């Protein structure tokens, strides 16, 4: 991530060899006024390890807190309920017998793994529904042109995000040149045209396909802005 940000010409301060939560916050603060901020903040988020539930207290990296647990949320999650049960066992039932502790130690491993798996499943479901509804919406806009920003660069094409948050793919097989993919710099460069596409570039696109059934939206690039 830091290498890519540097390739855009931005110089970041701080000790990048010893990344702390405060370092990440400083990086985001330095980038907040840049036109690519939304793209870069999402990229930084994807670079970070996915959080999982564990029986042991390992603190909270983002909050820079050595002590952290789930307690409540807008929707009552199972980890929240588990913490409530533990507190009730200790505070109200005053049950700290070795047998009780041993029972919970065994249960918490299973509960943590199960909760992590269900959260991943819920996230996948949410993404699929979002993709389906975006494709359904764009089915009635095929042939229309929009300005957008390149949100991701892959070996198979470019993802472009429109101002209305709809994201579609520009398949590399349908681009009018042979494009070379640079994974480190996250760019596609035309072999003949020398046109170079990177994260944050603004482009004018046309909607060429959209399917609710496949949850796919395809664009074609008209020109780089």
Q: Where are the language model's segments positioned?
A:
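C-terminal structured domains
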Residues: 192-194, 198
């Amino acid at each position: 991530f830091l290498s890519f940000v540097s390739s855009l010409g931005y110089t970041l301060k701080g000790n990048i060899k010893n990344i702390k939560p405060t370092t990440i916050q400083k990086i985001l603060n330095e980038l907040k006024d840049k036109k690519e901020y939304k793209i870069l903040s999402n990229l930084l988020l994807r670079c970070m390890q996915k959080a999982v539930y564990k029986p042991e207290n390992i603190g909270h990296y983002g909050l820079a807190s050595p002590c952290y647990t789930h307690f409540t949320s807008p929707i009552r999650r199972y980890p929240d309920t588990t913490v409530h049960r533990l507190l009730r066992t200790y505070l109200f039932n005053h049950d700290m017998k070795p047998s009780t502790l041993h029972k919970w130690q065994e249960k918490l491993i299973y509960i943590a793994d199960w909760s992590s798996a269900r959260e991943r499943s819920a996230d996948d479901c949410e993404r699929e529904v979002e993709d389906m509804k975006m494709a359904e919406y764009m089915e009635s806009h095929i042939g229309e042109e929009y300005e957008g920003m390149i949100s991701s660069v892959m070996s198979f094409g470019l993802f472009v995000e429109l101002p209305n948050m709809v994201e579609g793919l520009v398949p590399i097989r349908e681009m009018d040149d042979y494009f070379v993919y640079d994974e480190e710099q996250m760019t596609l460069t035309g072999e003949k045209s020398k046109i170079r596409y990177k994260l944050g570039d603004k482009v004018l696109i046309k909607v060429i396909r959209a399917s609710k059934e496949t949850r796919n939206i395809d664009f074609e690039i008209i020109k780089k802005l």
